[in-house]
UniProtKB/Swiss-Prot annotation:
This is Phosphatidylserine decarboxylase proenzyme. Its main location: membrane. Its EC number is 4.1.1.65. It comes from Rhizobium johnstonii (strain DSM 114642 / LMG 32736 / 3841). Catalyzes the formation of phosphatidylethanolamine (PtdEtn) from phosphatidylserine (PtdSer). Is synthesized initially as an inactive proenzyme. Formation of the active enzyme involves a self-maturation process in which the active site pyruvoyl group is generated from an internal serine residue via an autocatalytic post-translational modification. Two non-identical subunits are generated from the proenzyme in this reaction, and the pyruvate is formed at the N-terminus of the alpha chain, which is derived from the carboxyl end of the proenzyme. HAMAP family: PS_decarb_PSD_A. Coiled coil: none annotated. Binds 1 pyruvoyl group covalently per subunit. The record marks G189, S190 as: Cleavage (non-hydrolytic). GO terms for biological process: phosphatidylethanolamine biosynthetic process. Its cofactor is pyruvate. GO terms for cellular component: plasma membrane. Belongs to the phosphatidylserine decarboxylase family. PSD-A subfamily.
Amino acid sequence: MSLFNTVRNTIVPVHKEGYPFVAAFFVASLVLGWIFKPLFWIGMIFTLWCAYFFRDPERVTPQDDDLVISPADGKVSAIQMVTPPAELNLGSEPMLRISVFMNVFNCHVNRAPMHGRIVSINYRSGSFVNAELDKASEDNERNGLVIETGHGQIGVVQIAGLVARRILCWANPNEPVDAGERFGLIRFGSRLDVFLPAGAAPRVSLGQTAVAGETVIAEFASAKGPVISRRS
């Protein structure tokens, strides 16, 4: 294997949404270094951190239509039955909600939790309280997707946080989506909520670390039996 291929396979790529930020930090480092040389290295530390924040690693997604995959890197912060946000139009009956909180050190690229078709996308403006708080689901800026799957409609909600001020979503209504497929990004700390209908059982526990596109967070009952053992 050539040195070029070794380096390419070792370095985690940066998502294109991060290019302007990385470039800005680098230019600022050059300017600061011109004023006072040690400031260049301080600026480069922030430049590398910015590149790390916008990293976009490849993931290996389990291929099973009964599995629900984590849409985000982070910590499982909530597993509860709640009424879904009204803008999702998923009815008034409680659904299983699994929340994954992303801090500023997590990868912030969001991925689809299941195979299906995007039914709708609904953006709501709001405040920017700590995304780990329960009220963030109702008060904060958010963007909700409804996906039609083989087990019915599920909701995926991107929630802005205390620092995050920009939700990005590249998906469009009526488009097909694959489990683990990238569909959006939230800048600088945020949360993802997944709303699941009856028949879904959680396969993670509170406080567990989840990996977007890889960690199974829930599973739907099927005739073939469970694929993942239930987490206590």
